[in-house]
Amino acid sequence: MLARKDPMLGWNAIDICSKLRPTAPEVAALGPEFQGAWDRDFADNPNRPLMLCGVVSCFLGDPASIPEGQYVTSGMYTAYPYSRGHMHITGPKHDDPLDFDVGFFTDKDDIDLKKQMWAYKKQREILRRTNYFRGELAAGHPKFAKSSPAAVQEEVSGPVPKDAKNIVYSEEDDRAIEQWIRENVQTTWHSLGTCKMAEREKDGVVDSKLNVYGVTGLKIADLSIPPENVGGNTNNTALVIGEKAADIIINELRGGAGTP
């Protein structure tokens, strides 16, 4: 492929990305706590997606675990999680173990879990209407009862009609979805905020001049300092942080305020 300069070498296998937001009836169906979170954080901001979706032209898993074939994977993830984990040092040495907890699905009202459950159902409806749909890979789906309308269809002749009725999920199906999500959730590669800029009493690590609280002569200027996630690729955010950090440091070297 290198010798013939195959164009595939410049392809990341992701041809489609999208931002997804639920309809008003879908929000209401997720319960009053979800409705409250939606009204507070999303309803008046139409550019803020509930979920981000990347359609990848491969199987996002161990290829040795499935038969050879052509696969498409829909990756769903939230850019605005409510759950919070933690990462703390436990001693002064570089090899002292970290106190680390990812904190998946630990938010008070299970908003993150409800987001993922809604997203699973939504992306499934989208993909089974695409022209290339020829079935579902059981390894990438919850274990529904064979008698359930939600049961995986491993081989079909083509997509369902655009106006086909959506799959109806029972309480048993929802429990299967929840279990599958809890067992398979992972972190994507845009994580940030582990040393967020905020007041110390609000669990902040750095102040507005990038100084680490309680440490003299140490600044942080990378993607760990944003106080919350951003709804997109993080390259531009990193560049802005770097530019602003340069201004702060240059000003301090010239004798300006800001050095602790």
Residue ranges and their predicted role:
Residues M1-P67, T78-A79, D109-D110, K114-K121, ...:
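Mid-to-C-terminal "cap/lid" subdomains and adjacent gly/pro-rich loops that border
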Residues E68-V72:
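A Trp-anchored, charged/polar loop motif used as the substrate-binding/catalytic surface
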Residues T73-Y132, I167-P260:
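C-terminal structured subdomain/cap of oxidoreductase catalytic cores
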